[in-house]
């Protein structure tokens, strides 16, 4: 009766909207769990409608589309807490899944610190008018490829993903809400010989996407990489572009999760109220931002999302909480649940005053970094880490790019590198790709005295 792939469904002889379908699923599961003895239930059915276009060697190679419904559920039996996910929502399969949850509840240990779900909230529907337009996406891919090749790239590859996510929430505490959000992500990589470049664009509206700019950026980076330069290991001033900056700032956001603080994997443990980063740096999480690619009206516990300042002028102001971590920290949920771990929705970093060209002048002599991968922590609790630069790393002398570098690895401490920011750019952009899971809105930034080692001979 319920099918996985669809935007509208036939239900008892009539067509219903996705909102009603998700609510019907949630109510069915919630009522059955309460009938079977659950004292509290929170059900979140989700429909994800996506179109992905991959391109390689200047041509589209793969087009995939999907529309999938799944159900996440938190159920509480006395002092026992169970988290479940159902991906087969056919009537028989759903009944079998519920039966399995009931049986498995006998194996779950009781929790002595179980916080009740928050007071019920009925949320106003949040809808999107955005559509996934395959023809327009194809045009955007062509624009990105053409602008990259005009800049000198020999080969252009990448992926464009358009998604509309529809979430509902039904709680035994009376929580009820429906939320729709659209996101469009374009990631472009360029190649000339052994050199590579990267550009990207992210938005919640297709009209705000900048495919030509993303292609132009990736193409210009690979063009500049044709002039190799020599370098030695040591401490350098660096200009972090938004892509690498977002990846590194994301780890600061992870350290703000109260779950990671308790688990001993946060470098911000015991530092509440202390100045831990540069006064230039203010970081907030904002799950309510209309421009945030991951924004939603409610978190997984039915708490309204909001803007939470995590670090203000370098001083740690707040961790991210769900109701259980909030109880243990004697505070309130910040609207960031995760039934297991609270996490950021969208990270937003304050901007500075400099253009990119002015940032290069401020750097004067150092290294400009575009992107990175293979970030590894030697010690999560202290923030000691390394990461390898990719897709454009450049030697800067007297405020001008003089040559490209290979095999550059940052080997330093996360808190240390952000404790002495020299300047921030004035232009911010959203960054999200497979190395940056939490969308981050930030400018470029100049950091002094960053320790660099060689990942390969260069």
What are the residue ranges of the model-derived segments?
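Dual-mode signal for accessory low-complexity, basic/Gly-rich regions
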Residues: 271-458
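Acidic low-complexity segments
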Residues: 19-31, 36-52, 92-179, 212-246, ...
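Internal metal/ion-chelating core segments
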Residues: 175-269
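Structured beta-strand/loop patches that form or line metal/cofactor-binding pockets in enzymes
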Residues: 38-71, 156-177, 364-389
């Amino acid at each position: 009766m319920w099918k996985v792939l669809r935007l509208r469904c036939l239900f008892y002889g009539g067509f219903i909207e996705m909102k009603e379908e998700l609510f019907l699923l949630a109510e069915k599961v919630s009522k059955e769990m309460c009938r079977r003895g659950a004292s509290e239930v929170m059900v979140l059915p989700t429909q994800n409608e996506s179109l992905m276009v991959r391109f390689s060697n200047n041509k589209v190679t793969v087009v995939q589309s999907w529309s999938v419904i799944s159900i996440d559920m938190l159920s509480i039996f006395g002092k026992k807490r169970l988290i479940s996910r159902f991906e087969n929502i056919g009537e028989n399969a759903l009944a079998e899944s519920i039966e399995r949850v009931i049986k498995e509840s006998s194996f779950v240990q009781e929790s002595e610190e179980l916080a009740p779900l928050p007071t019920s909230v009925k949320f106003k529907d949040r809808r999107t008018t955005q559509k996934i337009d395959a023809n327009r996406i194809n045009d955007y891919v062509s624009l990105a490829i053409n602008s990259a090749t005009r800049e000198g790239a020999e080969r252009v590859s990448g992926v464009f993903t358009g998604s509309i996510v529809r979430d509902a929430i039904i709680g035994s505490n009376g929580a009820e809400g429906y939320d729709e959000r659209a996101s469009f992500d374009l990631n472009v990589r360029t190649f000339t010989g052994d050199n590579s470049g990267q550009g990207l664009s992210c938005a919640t509206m297709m009209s705000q996407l900048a495919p030509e700019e993303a292609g132009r950026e990736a193409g210009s980076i690979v063009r500049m990489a044709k002039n190799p330069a020599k370098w030695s290991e040591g401490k350098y001033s660096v200009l972090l572009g938004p892509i690498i900056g977002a990846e590194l700032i994301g780890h600061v956001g992870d350290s703000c999760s109260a779950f990671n603080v308790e688990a001993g994997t946060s470098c911000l443990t015991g530092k509440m109220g202390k100045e831990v980063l540069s006064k230039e740096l203010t970081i907030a999480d904002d799950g309510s931002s209309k421009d945030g690619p991951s924004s939603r009206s409610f978190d997984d516990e039915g708490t309204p999302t909001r803007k939470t300042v995590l670090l203000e002028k370098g001083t740690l102001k707040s961790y991210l909480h769900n109701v259980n971590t909030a109880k243990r920290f004697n505070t309130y949920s910040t609207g960031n649940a995760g039934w297991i771990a609270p996490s950021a929705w969208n990270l937003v970093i304050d901007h500075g005053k400099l253009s990119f060209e002015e940032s290069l002048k401020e750097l004067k002599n150092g290294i400009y970094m575009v992107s990175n991968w293979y970030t590894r922590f030697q010690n999560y609790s202290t923030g000691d880490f390394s990461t390898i630069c990719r897709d454009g790393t450049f030697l800067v002398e007297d405020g001008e790019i003089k040559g490209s570098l290979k095999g550059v690895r940052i080997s330093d401490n996360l808190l240390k590198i952000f404790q002495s920011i020299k300047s921030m750019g004035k232009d911010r952009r959203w960054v999200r790709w497979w190395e940056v899971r939490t969308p981050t809105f930030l400018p470029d930034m100049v950091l002094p005295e960053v320790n660099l080692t060689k990942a390969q001979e260069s």
